[in-house]
């Protein structure tokens, strides 16, 4: 009752509706306008009376009463005196809530600089004054005077003077001839007297004249700050404070603890310091104290204000009583525990509970089991309301009692309340949106939440003690969204790749697999059954078994929906699965008339979903789960020790390999191969042996055996069934159980040469066990570290992509990406069909032979189209992509294509950026958590040959070959590609051939699929001569540039080039091998250069001086890096490196133009390479390459734009600059996909494209035109387009720019929204920049809206935003018409606008 009366007198303040938030610097006048009074005393509260001191930090006169409607002295109490100010204590009679919003101020006796503008790098104050930060600090902290007005003296403006110099100057010139000041007053004067317009003009003219890069950068930085001040209306002198605002007392509370002590916020301490020093300074000034004392006090005041705003930014950190640094205002905002991330983005919610989960196989997919106790607590308000409505109770208090006593009627009402009221279940860590799903609760006894087994994959949950949280959606809208969008039955497909995620796993798979096995010679083989009833009868009476080969009639419907039946050769088990299939012509019995491995089950569910829709799929999944569990239970598959079969041939394979290894040792001892080569070969040999043993073991386990007596097939090996069905375990783990464990990796990632020959069944020897512990421990350490890394990657991805939302239907762009199949080492790893499915065709797709249309331009490519396209043998297709979408904010539906989680075109308002970030980030954590599953077992992947992946005719591009002395064809070209053309002359595959490879085919040869095209040594890279002659060495000085390394164990010497630049004597050498012709002159190459081959560090010489060589002979070999194990451990940092667009350590150098290589004069330790352009009018380009890097080009080689001059990982920026956006996109997509593919994770390309789009938002101005930009400015792409449109309208010259690639962290910090950037990283820096520029945040992204507490502009919230936008534009239109006076504007109904969906692309 009381509350209701209160509400009558205090109408709730209506929620403010705003569209944007602006941040700027507060002027002293502004701070005073906020304030309710000045704080003069450092006292907080009176410790005897517990009343706040007057004019102190908690003063009730300034900030408001402590108790509602009661003044401090108690003269006025109650509501009737509302608004009266007590004449005795001066306190206004009002709500105590005002103590949360009323501010005070401290009037400073001397101005102080705001530390953010001083110390947040780059320092704004020093840049604006064009001084160094050190100098500004010297003035501010009273070390030096600064000349502000030199007058007619010889002093310069802004010259620093020490105390002595100042005194001398005063003596020399007299005190009134010049002005020199010290402290913040000096800086204040200088800032106040700045003429910004004049400075900007000067800077612009200076910029036009200057040529040096460094100077330009400096001038641009200063000009940017000057312009920011001019545009934002901020004054430079506001960066120096004369008044300090004091935040409301209830935001820095002082709480009494028991025992008469108090807990206080650190801010009170910091404020106290400021007030104390300020009061002391006032007193000193009044007393006319000596200058030095006043200066010292001013310095201390400056330091205390610094500590209040940002403790520890400058000088020592101010600590409290317990040596803990005090939390300043900046620390309140920063970091994970700061205001942004802790309270605004990470709110805790009411109406929630958590408990352990257990499996609930009898639940339907849309249900979950909720413990009664929990439900009673969660739904309390609903129960109270219902009790009241039904007349069981008349007050809330009564209802409370009924519920506490758990009366029977309460349970009935709980049932009613819960009915069709979905709840949300969430399992931490929530890595993607499937980590929170809605279910309908069913009440269960006990205290554990029951979870449906099929959703475990999505939650990544298991029942070994996992806990889950339950949340109750309260409002009708929330319940509706939970039901329509978040229900588990609506999340059948995985948003990352569009494959079903509601797929049976483990026991269920095993049961279904067991059901679908077909065995020979079972009872009743060959029987025929007319319908399923008969079959059930036969199974019950054991006439047939589940695995008998029978002929059975299966009834279904054809494509028109007419019933028909057909007889299949099948087994009773498979017919039982078929019985559950929905009746649909597109879902034939054939999809389950096979062994049901996990893959096949997934395909089956996918087919059912695509053709029968969601409802049928859900019912089908539930039934198939029941069937799987039932038969897994019946089959009783278990495994024992003898199921692990050790192949008989293992001993022989091991012995053979040991002999081979001995042979390699011998070769090494004889000096034929190097230590590195031996290592590589040994590791390779053991790798092959392990594979062989594994193959033998698999063959043994797979083998089908028959019982001699009955002739029936023996049951299959249990372990094989588990692994083959996909229920649990991998061939790799089986190999470790029954084959041999194989090679292990050291913690550093190198492989230990001695493998583990035993397996787990035989048991490991002590040495083997010790070797294996490295891998095991590394796995565990990695797991711990990588989880954090992966989480951080996800956070950065979400941050960069959060404002990418589908805002329009079609942007009508004419650009897109070209998609081809990805072929790796002759294997198609991603087919063209898989990559274009669910994307929009950019051009019409026609059959290359018949010319008939397969897909129209602008239409989505669906499953049937993919089949047609692959049949037609089309090699590449141009599709629309989010990367090339021309919408200004967000992307359009057509460019994005299919919504993978729904299988339909993407809806308006879908937050595709966040989905992309989650899809990429989620497997990162999964994989890192899985590292140790490999147990550090090494897998050696080294490619040493090229196979034909198709049948056809060979064509060699850039052919440059020689026949060597053995008569083999050797590739001498740097960029030769072997292409295979089909009979129509269409290119089917194209693969690069490494320099020095042996070719087995030549131009025009016919090849079969799988035929070897070329091979090479995977461990070394040869250097070969293309002319015959005699060898001569140049600059190969013993001990300086070449070392005769004698191998201790063998006594054989080999010559290896060493780093000749490490000694001063060798710095000018150019080690090379020269070929002389018969007359003793240097032989000439076919391209006109000399036959001089420059050597790189570590090259091993294969010839001696004076040796006669013929064409194609090897002169030297450069060893390649030894094999490291491939693990996502290398993968996660690689993904981060690509997304952060970092330059790799030894990055490739890419040719910027087509042309001929010329080697220029070398520098001390760099080699000059010049490309002479092929076409006229292009400048030659020069590169500097570190000597000693393997450099394979010769003088006169022809090189194409985009070819590598120096091998390595290319820097993404170079690809963008040289080859353009499309090449960059395909590089990043392929590289990132490769990491995930290694782990068998499927992610759709479009997710990576969305992130890359966000990385390409900025443009660097190359030609400013008539705009106000400066060359070299980084501008938002959208902003530039807008500015150019205006310029073109006015008939001026537009500005031009090149796209810039930013890493995801940088891109996040450069978003237009300062709120989003500040909540991500570097909070102070972001806010400082934004304040100076007077930035306005338009609240476009998701994050900013969450922070200010509005609905996000995506999904259902997006619709509201849209309606508001349309309404605003309507209002403007009507006002415009009224102004024109043409009467009311004819307004079409709002709905029509909605139907047209957001205005078309601008």
Swiss-Prot record:
Keyword Zinc: yes
Chain positions recorded as Zn(2+) 1 binding sites: 71, 73, 86, 89
Superkingdom, natural source: Bacteria
Gene Ontology cellular component annotations, sorted alphabetically: DNA-directed RNA polymerase complex
InterPro entries: DNA-dir_RpoC_beta_prime (IPR045867), DNA-dir_RpoC_beta_prime_bact (IPR012754), RNA_pol_asu (IPR000722), RNA_pol_N (IPR006592), RNA_pol_Rpb1_1 (IPR007080), RNA_pol_Rpb1_3 (IPR007066), RNA_pol_Rpb1_3_sf (IPR042102), RNA_pol_Rpb1_4 (IPR007083)
E.C. numbers: 2.7.7.6
Keyword NAD: no
Swiss-Prot/TrEMBL catalytic activity: RNA(n) + a ribonucleoside 5'-triphosphate = RNA(n+1) + diphosphate
Pfam families recorded: RNA_pol_Rpb1_1, RNA_pol_Rpb1_2, RNA_pol_Rpb1_3, RNA_pol_Rpb1_4, RNA_pol_Rpb1_5
CDD domains, per database record: RNAP_beta'_C, RNAP_beta'_N
Record key words, sorted: DNA-directed RNA polymerase, Magnesium, Metal-binding, Nucleotidyltransferase, Transcription, Transferase, Zinc
SMART domains recorded: RPOLA_N
GO BP annotation list: DNA-templated transcription
Enzyme class: transferase
MF (Gene Ontology): DNA binding; DNA-directed RNA polymerase activity; magnesium ion binding; zinc ion binding
Names of required cofactors: Mg(2+); Zn(2+)
Co-factor remark: Binds 1 Mg(2+) ion per subunit.
Binding site for Zn(2+) 2: 811, 885, 892, 895
Binding site for Mg(2+): 462, 464, 466
HAMAP family found in the cross-reference section: RNApol_bact_RpoC
Function (record text): DNA-dependent RNA polymerase catalyzes the transcription of DNA into RNA using the four ribonucleoside triphosphates as substrates.
The protein's assembly and partners: The RNAP catalytic core consists of 2 alpha, 1 beta, 1 beta' and 1 omega subunit. When a sigma factor is associated with the core the holoenzyme is formed, which can initiate transcription.
Record NCBIfam families: rpoC_TIGR
Protein name, as recorded: DNA-directed RNA polymerase subunit beta'
Source organism of the structure: Rhizobium etli (strain CIAT 652)
